[in-house]
């Protein structure tokens, strides 16, 4: 396939156009007076959203060159969403402004390496500042307040999040599910576990928006060995297909033909499945698989030591769970099908091992297993009058939960873009003997005004006047309330942001902007002419797999 190489001023224009497109599309959603965006969908009616992350992920520019840069810019939002669960629109506005500021320096033939160096020095200083002004939160009341603010002032959501954290601990596992009742909004603690292994392949993803696999009422197949061949699994998988249920395979590894066949079957829609590597190594992996077996109620697991093969299994031997959520880094089992008496006995056994061991390392690992098995999972159930309302409320609760977790982790700072604005004073004191590196520092310094300027403009006010007044006040807690259109104390007014969200937004923006600043060329494929030849896509079932 032929391709085209773009460089120089032509590339710089493509980068600017892509940045302008992303900022103009998502920027209007920022802040309390942010405006909604209507997005067309490939199925169903259009979707109305104020979620900047959704907007950016739905951008599909016709120009292939701009599309490639938009894809790269999306990494800033994805990083922010993945690490902090929020701050995606702020990251977008920051990176767009940095690119705009960098262009004039690139045109002036400044050293791109030095620009990048200056940007990173500025980033490090601002991160230190954010951490220094962050206020830690500890009480259930403070957690409820942060949750309420994160949910646009909804105190009920804040109180439920605080209740859930109180039940399973600040580090505990909390999930959000769709409830059945019209006004249902409840918190319950069920048997469950989370471990730090994710899907083996991203092709298993069922929710592309969140980049996760979600299954309700799946089977759980456990194997303390590598699974490489699909043939021994076919009879069992065919039975699972007929039951119209999903299966999560947790094994030492799933590779080769087995992995390929599972992925292809999932992509064809014939089998709902996901493969996950088992947590731990050696004997610890065996023990953790046994924990999962007891939690899910599986009768046995595939193991050479036990003489149990995949061929010998039936669905009655498999474990179950009410739901399983799998990301690229973790797996959460909610309400496993195991008997409470069996789980309690296993917990008691682990406690005995903790008391008997003389190794600090072994004790630590046993305590980790105990926490995973005994801690349980808090489930927030959210109901509504319609499917659309339930989904919207569920998304809102999930966003508030992410933000609250981030706040508990690193504290809170003045919101509304004020913390980044006040960090300008820190960069005023940062200088470099190298003019090009100083230009890089100035790129970040100028961008720090962008988020609050966008928030103010969305409220219909003059951003230059507001930012000037805030900078002149030299009070980091003084912010502009874009809803009430007045200056207030951030903490008294409850307009705060999780420090982690602000930090990650800045770090993600500098990361992506510095890549684009130093990029010299872009290679894109040229469109091929359709010669009318028939499609070569394979059809039908796969030999030896029973057509599942």
Swiss-Prot record:
The gene is groEL. It comes from the Bacteria. GO terms for biological process: protein refolding. It is found in: Cytoplasm. It catalyses: ATP + H2O + a folded polypeptide = ADP + phosphate + an unfolded polypeptide. Forms a cylinder of 14 subunits composed of two heptameric rings stacked back-to-back. Interacts with the co-chaperonin GroES. Changing residue 163 to K: In strain: SHSN-2. Changing residue 277 to N: In strain: Drpepper/horse/California. This is Chaperonin GroEL. Together with its co-chaperonin GroES, plays an essential role in assisting protein folding. The GroEL-GroES system forms a nano-cage that allows encapsulation of the non-native substrate proteins and provides a physical environment optimized to promote and accelerate protein folding. Changing residue 299 to R: In strain: Stagnicola/snail/Oregon. Belongs to the chaperonin (HSP60) family. InterPro entries: Chaperonin_Cpn60_CS, Cpn60/GroEL, Cpn60/GroEL/TCP-1, GroEL-like_apical_dom_sf, GROEL-like_equatorial_sf, TCP-1-like_intermed_sf. GO terms for cellular component: cytoplasm. Its EC number is 5.6.1.7. GO terms for molecular function: ATP binding; ATP-dependent protein folding chaperone; isomerase activity; unfolded protein binding. ATP binds at residues 29-32, 50, 86-90, 416, 497. The lineage of its organism: Bacteria, Pseudomonadati, Pseudomonadota, Alphaproteobacteria, Rickettsiales. Keywords: ATP-binding, Chaperone, Cytoplasm, Isomerase, Nucleotide-binding. It holds the Pfam family Cpn60_TCP1.
């Amino acid at each position: 396939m032929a391709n085209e190489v773009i460089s120089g001023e032509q590339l710089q224009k493509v980068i600017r156009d892509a940045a302008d497109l992303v900022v103009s599309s998502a920027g209007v959603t920022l802040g309390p007076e942010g405006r909604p965006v209507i997005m067309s969908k490939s199925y169903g009616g259009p979707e109305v959203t104020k979620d900047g992350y959704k907007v950016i992920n739905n951008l599909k520019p016709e120009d292939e060159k701009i599309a490639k840069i938009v894809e790269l810019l999306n990494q800033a939002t994805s990083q922010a969403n993945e690490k902090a669960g929020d701050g995606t629109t702020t990251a977008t506005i920051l990176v767009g402004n940095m690119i705009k500021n960098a262009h004039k320096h690139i045109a002036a033939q400044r050293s791109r390496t030095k620009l990048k160096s200056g940007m990173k020095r500025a980033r490090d200083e601002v991160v230190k500042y954010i951490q220094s002004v962050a206020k830690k939160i500890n009480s259930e009341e403070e957690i409820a307040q942060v949750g309420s603010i994160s949910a646009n002032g909804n105190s009920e959501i804040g109180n439920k999040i605080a209740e859930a954290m109180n039940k399973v601990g600040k580090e505990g596992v909390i999930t959000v599910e769709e409830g059945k009742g019209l006004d249902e909004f409840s918190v319950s603690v069920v048997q469950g576990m989370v471990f730090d292994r994710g899907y083996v392949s991203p092709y298993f993803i069922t929710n592309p928006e969140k980049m996760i696999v979600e299954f309700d009422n799946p089977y759980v197949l456990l194997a303390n060995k590598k699974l490489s061949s699909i043939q021994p699994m076919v009879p069992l998988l065919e039975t699972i297909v007929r039951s119209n249920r999903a299966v999560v395979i947790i094994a030492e590894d799933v590779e080769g033909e087995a992995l390929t066949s599972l992925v292809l079957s999932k992509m064809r829609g014939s089998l709902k499945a996901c493969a996950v590597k088992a947590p731990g190594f050696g004997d610890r992996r065996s023990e953790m698989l046994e924990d999962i077996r007891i939690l899910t109620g599986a009768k046995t697991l595939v193991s050479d030591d036990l003489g149990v093969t995949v061929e010998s299994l039936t669905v009655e031997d498999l474990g179950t769970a009410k739901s399983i959520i799998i990301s690229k880094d973790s797996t959460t089992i909610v309400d496993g099908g195991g008997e409470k008496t069996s789980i309690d006995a296993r917990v008691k056994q682990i406690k005995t091992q903790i008391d008997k061991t003389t190794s600090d390392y072994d004790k630590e690992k046993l305590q980790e297993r105990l926490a995973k098995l005994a801690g349980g999972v808090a489930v927030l159930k959210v109901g509504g009058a319609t499917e659309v309302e339930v989904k919207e409320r569920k998304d809102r609760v999930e966003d508030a939960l992410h933000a609250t977790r981030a706040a508990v982790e690193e504290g809170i700072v003045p919101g509304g873009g004020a913390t980044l604005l006040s960090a300008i004073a820190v960069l005023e004191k940062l200088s470099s003997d190298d003019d090009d590196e100083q230009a890089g520092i100035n790129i970040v310094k100028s961008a720090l005004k962008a988020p609050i300027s966008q928030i103010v403009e969305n409220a219909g006010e003059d951003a230059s006047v507001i930012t000037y007044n805030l900078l002149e006040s030299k009070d980091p807690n003084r912010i502009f309330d874009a809803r009430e259109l007045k200056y207030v104390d951030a903490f008294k007014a409850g307009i705060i942001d999780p420090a982690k969200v602000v930090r990650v937004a800045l770090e993600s923006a500098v990361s992506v902007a510095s890549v684009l600043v130093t990029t010299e060329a872009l290679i894109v494929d040229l469109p091929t002419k359709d010669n009318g030849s028939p499609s070569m896509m394979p059809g039908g079932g796969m030999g030896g797999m029973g057509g599942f």
